[in-house]
């Protein structure tokens, strides 16, 4: 059974950065992914993350946020996605929380199955799992933790 994790989403703070909490609050729109990319760039530069790790981080976290916006928040612009991170000398972890109801993350189609090869979506979680060192879902899937060993 997964642990219940709650983050309060503040609807009055679209697309803002809380540097004390290392958090980014995003509205559910495509341009939020550009804001996320800039935030990840700055974070990785500030903390001297290797270029090899940077690419994996950028793709995996962007996939998670895109899923949160599209599938969790259903592209409802007033719904927010919170992205935060924690860093120590061994790992960099990202936490992505949306306002959706979650999903059955234990019952996903295999994107490498020949029947799914031509399907236009369904690869985000597969990429997240292969580009990071650990992916953990909480709150029935509306909260994801992605860990990168350093």
Task: List where the protein language model places each region.
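Conserved beta-strand-loop-beta-strand hairpin that lines the nucleotide-binding pocket
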Residues: 2-22, 69-150
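STAS-typified acidic loop motif
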Residues: 22-34
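Structural signature of the histidine kinase catalytic ATP-binding subdomain
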Residues: 28, 49-52, 76
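Long cytosolic heptad-repeat coiled-coil signaling/dimerization helices
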Residues: 31, 35-38, 52
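Acidic-residue sensor for enzyme active/binding pockets
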Residues: 37, 63, 145
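Conserved short strand/loop->alpha-helix "switch" segment adjacent to the catalytic nucleotide/phosphoryl-transfer site
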Residues: 40-62, 117-118
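Short alpha-helix lining the ATP-binding pocket of the histidine-kinase-like ATPase
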Residues: 62, 66, 70
